Amino acid sequence: MFRLTLLLAYVACVYGGGAPYGADRGKCRGNDYEKDGLCCTSCPPGSYASRLCGPGSDTVCSPCKNETFTASTNHAPACVSCRGRCTGHLSESQSCDKTRDRVCDCSAGNYCLLKGQEGCRICAPKTKCPAGYGVSGHTRTGDVLCTKCPRYTYSDAVSSTETCTSSFNYISVEFNLYPVNDTSCTTTAGPNEVVKTSEFSVTLNHTDCDPVFHTEYYGTSGSEGAGGFFTGMDRYQNTTKMCTLNIEIRCVEGDAVRTIPRTSDGVGVLSHSETITVIGGCLSDVNVDIEYSDSNHPEEVDDFVEYHWGTRLRLFPSPKRCRLVS
């Protein structure tokens, strides 16, 4: 027990290190402090002066206890209490130890209402932009600014981070053909969409298109035929993918292959591509009109592309649903 007491006393003296010396015109060296005309050793960070110096004895320093600290050299009579635990919308960004205070910052999804000397004292949840709006910036305090998504953009998430991205949620594919005779047709829905008559078939193959095709029609007037494929409006296109449509118009007779040229390029801001192919020689005139649009902005002009070969056709017969083939 006697040896332990001596050891503790030695450790305390080591913190102080050295004996007081006289101040030079009231000034001490380095970080030493002046007391009663004597210069004494300051305690290092992480400790405090459990006993100040006196004639013949230097400062006695003791380590800070848990949840207390001193960040610099000092001769304070006690360590400073660390800030309380980070709770609520706060999360700990710096832990409390003997040389530094605890620092709290806002947890994810929150912004700072009241800053402290370090970190934040009070945080609040960031505003969440509703569907159809995106994050456009931040206030001076860090809250979210929401702006209605402009033309050809959308955000379908309720979020404090999502921005408006170029997208569409509706695709319509309409075709006009000449000459045709058969007024009856069948369709097949699934991975590919097909309209079929006794003279030809129109097959729509689609890759990486999120809007789902589920409606089709076909009708005739005289020797002209018209049909179409349409998606629902409940799914937006993922803008990291390219929606690709490959439309094959195949005559029952003939095997000559023609690629129909694009005659209208649209606005060119949405992620899509198309290929229109005619196989066989039963048709002299082909028009394919494809529209990509956002149903939440019906007042805006759609992204419209046109493919044409032969005479331009503008037939719009009364839609006729085809008989479904499973």
UniProtKB/Swiss-Prot annotation:
CDD domains, sorted: TNFRSF_viral (cd15839)
GO BP terms, alphabetized: positive regulation of membrane protein ectodomain proteolysis; regulation of T cell proliferation; symbiont-mediated perturbation of host defense response
GO function term, MF aspect, one: tumor necrosis factor receptor activity
Each TNFR-Cys repeat, start to end: 27-62, 63-104, 105-147, 148-186
Signal peptide residues on this chain, from the entry's feature table: 1-16
Keywords: Disulfide bond, Glycoprotein, Receptor, Repeat, Signal, Virulence
SMART domains: TNFR (SM00208)
Cysteine disulfide links: C28-C39, C40-C53, C43-C61, C64-C79, C82-C96, C86-C104, C106-C120, C123-C146, C129-C149, C164-C185
Protein function: Binds to TNF-alpha and beta. Probably prevents TNF to reach cellular target and thereby deampening the potential antiviral effects of the cytokine.
Protein name (Swiss-Prot/TrEMBL): Tumor necrosis factor soluble receptor
